[in-house]
Amino acid sequence: EKLYCEPTGNFQHNPEPLEKNLGDIMNLMKGGKADVAFVVDPDVDRLAMICEDGKMYGEEYTLVTVADYVLKHTPGNTVSNLSSTRALRDVTRKYGQEYYASAVGEVNVTTKMKEVGAVIGGEGNGGVIYPASHYGRDALVGIALFLSHLAHEGKKVSELRASYPAYFMAKNRVDLTPETDVDAILAKVKELYKNEEINDIDGVKIDFPDKWVHLRKSNTEPIIRVYSEAATPEAAEEIGQQIMKVIEELAK
């Protein structure tokens, strides 16, 4: 089976490897002729997978799965950015190792990785950074590590995905006026939730025992991006909306 093999100079769909852009290959996978599909972006630094049943593996779980394999063979620390899934922390702790969070951005992740001597790291958008190869996001390295792990585990791709902690993410934004002092609002939110675990190296991240919310201001427009994660989609959306209401009240 082949898809889009005619080099016309145009992408057949939005090249960002997200579920909404990958309907054709997901349908192809439902035919049961392949064990896994790999999808990369144009510069091959983001990796998404599709299971044998045609369902998305989940971009956030690319790094989690690769880290599971690396940690099993090379114990050490891990790093991802503040907006990435908590599942990496869980897998890291399973091996008795330390997880560290960095500010968003590849350069921030790699700087933190070097600082703590991480054996694997990356970003939740499917970006895998494997220092034993090089300090940059590399989807081909990610594919090699994923296939190695799949071979060692002897599972279907969907079974492998089901073996990891289940988290769901919600992404929202609060639109403010140009006159709004966004930094002051973030400082007030931080104060309101001071009894929770707070990280302010890149906006404000509030870590609750069973969920988290990460607030980041835009440098180009008066908005605050709100990322949240919890054990169900509903809980992730609920905590995100809750914090958004707090922001809107503070902005009045």
Locate the predicted segments by residue.
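Phosphate-binding chemistry for phosphorylated carbohydrates and sugar-nucleotides
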Residues: 1-153, 160, 166
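Catalytic-core signal marking the mid-to-C-terminal active-site face
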Residues: 153-252
